Amino acid sequence: MLHVLWTFWILVAMTDLSRKGCSAQASLSCDAAGVCDGRSRSFTSIPSGLTAAMKSLDLSNNKITSIGHGDLRGCVNLRALILQSSGINTIEEDAFSSLSKLEYLDLSDNHLSNLSSSWFRPLSSLKYLNLLGNPYRILGETPLFLNLTHLQTLRVGNVATFSGIRRTDFAGLTSLDELEIKALSLQNYEPGSLQSIQSIHHLTFHLSQSDFLLGVFEDTLSSVGYLELRDANLDSFYFSELSTDEMNSPMKKLAFQNADLTDESFNELLKLLRYTPELLEVEFDDCTLNGVGDFQPSESDVVRELGKVETLIIRRLHIPRFYSFYDLSTVYTLLEKVKRITVENSKVFLVPCLFSQHLKSLEFLDLSENLMVEEYLKNAACEGSWPSLQTLILRQNRLKSIERTGKILLTLKNLTALDISRNSFQSMPDSCQWPGKMRFLNLSSTGIQAVKMCIPQTLEVLDVSNNNLISFSLFLPLLRELYISRNKLHTLPDASLFPVLLVMKIRENAISTFSKDQLSSFPKLVSLEAGGNHFICSCELLSFTLEHPALVQVLAGWPDSYLCDSPSRLRGQRVQDARPSVLECHQTLLVSGVCCALVLLILLIGGLCHHFHGLWYLRMMWAWLQAKRKPKKAPCRDICYDAFVSYSEQDSYWVENLMVQQLENSEPPFKLCLHKRDFVPGKWIIDNIIDSIEKSHKTLFVLSENFVRSEWCKYELDFSHFRLFDENNDAGILVLLEPIEKKAIPQRFCKLRKIMNTKTYLEWPLDEGQQEVFWVNLRTAIKS
């Protein structure tokens, strides 16, 4: 037993710690303006540490069961407090005592079963109060709202338990913009309960029992401008005379939402209208008519009193026995002066011709989302029907032919605006007939693929949005507004087609760019909405947006709706913020710069080659490649000469008459290779030089000023230099025929200059006594 108790205690402790941990982790998020968000944070109590800096506090969707007297003490500057769906069942008497500046309080959908006037006594600045969805039966034991003199919006009641409304419940309230009372379980309504409120702009009353309708209606006749009755079952409603003689009601609009009616109860409701001489609009939303349209208003004065009603709106009317529905002939006279009729999404497929002819004052007719086809439309638009009609809306019906629809409507002489959008036309003929005064035409979402001359030339507003158009080339001289969004256009239409165009909406097409010329070609354009297209953020587009801010001001939605689609690195960025690379924006300048740089580089390389003998190195490379095809060292049988003699033609006398005689006639004789004598006729001279040097044991250079200036001597010196460099030997012999400076030998012949710097060279003596020694030394050098 002790073990069980111990285990239970541990579980309880862990649960408690878990709750505390969750509470500790939850926190408010507040911005600099003092707006604090604590929605859905699993708070079990009002968070601590609330300060005077808070202006708005939202703690909806939490688990706060109670509000203590000190929980909100620090919020002295709070303007809005939202506690919707927070599980609150208890509020202490002075919980709101510090909230004198509070203007907005939402306590809806909690568990408050008893309301206390002390909660609201300090809230002298309150403008909005929502008490819907709490399980109270009545609005407190004492009047709740005596001190709420600034209250503008009040919502009270619930679905299940709110059962009584008393005369004192709304005491202290003199004027409200909006009052909503949800009393679907109402069992008691004291007459005069709403009379204390002198003015209510909009009263919404959820009332399921029709027994209290007359009492509510009578109490609000002198104060309510717009009465909306919701969720009412009026099948058994019966009108009995009102006790009031009030005939100057300010009521302008009467609406029924989610109400059930019968033919008989509709007749009874008409009797209420004699008390609302200023009534202009009657509306039925989501109602059910449990009848067949056999309306038989019995009093002639009803017809007279209905004369000021200008607007009748019927939306989503459900008629279970619509197949037995009458032709409405009994109410023709009721609607003769009505100017605006909307019958939307109510399965209307036919309007009798006679009914249309009785609607002599009708200027606006909306039959959207019904079942009209051309055949029955022709019956509705018969000759003499709707003589004053200016606007006709047939959106989302079953129309198939634009041509036939236009022809049917020729009977409507005053028609200026036609909406036939969301019908399945698919195609457009080349020509059509339309009423002569047409100014507005809506063909959006009809599947058309091209715009042709079928469109009337009198149009000032045209909507062809959400179709399959790839171009627009129709001339419309009077067009002021063009709506062509969600198509497949790749460019703006030609401005010459619309000389007076003011507004164009061309969102979500395939437009990639536009230019100054395009926009400036629309002389009167004040608004162009082109966001949502696939813009290529090219340099031209960006330059246009930066350089022409006045034209950019025409772009509606700029800059947030204009995003780059390409290049990929800019995708998703605003066009205004995109920054392409220099390469993309200055290609011509960049190419010119590169070309100039290349020319300068070539000139620089040429200058360096000239200065550092680059051509010589190229020739050496060529010679090296040629020499590489041959063995580095020729076999002994290939050595044909003891020495190859390189000399200038100006020194030929000394070479041929002195040196050749001394060397070739000596014992043993030397075999010399001379270019005059031994070069192979017809062979390329450079090949002769290379072969002669390679077939010679030594290369003998007769250096003189003439040698340095000789071009062919330089070639021979070049290839000899290559051999010295490549084979790393001492095959070169220098003979100075006359004194010459070492620097006269080009710097590039580093090997030969090294020889002159490190080895003794032979110098031809002018003294005849020393010349014999010279020949001996020369023979020795050749033999080595």
UniProtKB/Swiss-Prot annotation:
It comes from Cricetulus griseus (Chinese hamster). This is Toll-like receptor 2. Ubiquitinated at Lys-754 by PPP1R11, leading to its degradation. Deubiquitinated by USP2. Glycosylation of Asn-442 is critical for secretion of the N-terminal ectodomain of TLR2. It is a single-pass type I membrane protein. GO terms for cellular component: Golgi apparatus; membrane raft; phagocytic vesicle membrane; plasma membrane; receptor complex. The record marks 349 as: Interaction with bacterial lipopeptide. Residues 610-784 are cytoplasmic. A motif (ATG16L1-binding motif) lies at residues 761-778. The lineage of its organism: Eukaryota, Metazoa, Chordata, Craniata, Vertebrata. Cooperates with LY96 to mediate the innate immune response to bacterial lipoproteins and other microbial cell wall components. Cooperates with TLR1 or TLR6 to mediate the innate immune response to bacterial lipoproteins or lipopeptides. Acts via MYD88 and TRAF6, leading to NF-kappa-B activation, cytokine secretion and the inflammatory response. May also promote apoptosis in response to lipoproteins.
